[in-house]
Amino acid sequence: MAKRDIIKNQFHTYKDTYTGTNVTRLTEPDHVSHHMYFYNNMMTSDGKKLLYSAELNGERQLYLMDIETGDAVQMTEGTGVADYSGMITADDRYLIYRQGERFMKQDLDTGEEECFYETPEGWSAGGDLGPSSDYKYMSIVETRKDTTAKRKVGGNWDAFAENCLAKPLCRIVYIDMEKGTSRIIHEERCWLGHTQIRPIYGDKILFCHEGPYDLIDARLWCINIDGTGLTCLREQPSDLIITHEIWMPDGESVAYVYKETTGKMEENIRMIPMSTMKEEVFMNCSPYAHFNVAPSGKYMVGDSQGHDVPIHMLDHSKEKDRTGEVKNDFIYIVDVEARKEIKLCYHGSSWRAIYGNSQDTHPHPFFTKDSKHVIFTTDLEGKPCLYMAEV
């Protein structure tokens, strides 16, 4: 298949057994498909088209799906397409994605492309792209290749601890996507990830020290875009999991999931306002692996993990638990004003890294533009598929 080819997805709608929610499977379980990384902008402004990845004919490419008809246009071709990296610019004009070490901008109308940045020789680019709200700038992490751990074959978690302990030389790069210029913001011997430019303000970059929770010094870090003001946002003892931090849409606070592995085993959503830099407990929650915020800021959504064992420590040698037990693998909606959690539907993901990428079975839920649906990924019915639940 090639760029601009069209595939036709067959939708299947059902009522969730546990909540009665209407859920529509958007792709078919005979091949792997998933949406982009959960905080990427992957829908057009009118909410009618969805950017996702599908593995067909042995390779993963990006597709743009009409969520009313299921028709999807192939947007990329060739090897090395980073299947979680794509995003649509706020003005709906361009698709931004990474292919190998090249960062591409594709005109959605004409299909014309240009490379606006390429990682230098000897370095490798990470998968996460952190755009500014106006999509003029982007932050990424680059790692010097000769400092990383020797990764084992397969899209599993074997190298997660090894790469953390190797303390690779990483740097945060700030890119002007319009001018094609760049500068290095920060560099250190530590595995860095998840750079996110502060919404609205655009003055800071949130990033993490990546690796198992009991091996890193602290996960949450922030730095000004001029490279000054490096700040650890929160101390992190070795028995505490802090995960999947995000900016609130107004850029005023950083939010994240806090989970104790000893003592009271407390789990809740917490925030750090930039005005005070003092942590606030927002509300207790189910054991979310990831959570996201609606564009309006009125709702949150989380994918609960029924296993007590952290994802990277699961036994990934088998496909799924076959006991028939229904664990707390549900999608939850949070009413921000009421601080109330509501069970939306069962995602039933196996959480297993067996399809080629360790992220493939992660639900990674996010809201559609009008907040009337939540889209997520699960391998509930076969290989990972895209699902859309009515809120």
Where are these regions (language model features)?
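Blade/loop signatures of beta-propeller domains
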Residues: 2-24, 164-170
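Short, conserved, GDST-rich strand-edge loop motifs in beta-rich repeat architectures
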Residues: 4-6, 140-167, 208-217, 259-263, ...
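Asp-box/WD-like beta-propeller blade repeats and closely related beta-sheet repeat scaffolds
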Residues: 80-170, 184-187
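Loop/turn-rich, solvent-exposed surfaces of beta-rich toroidal or solenoidal domains
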Residues: 283-342
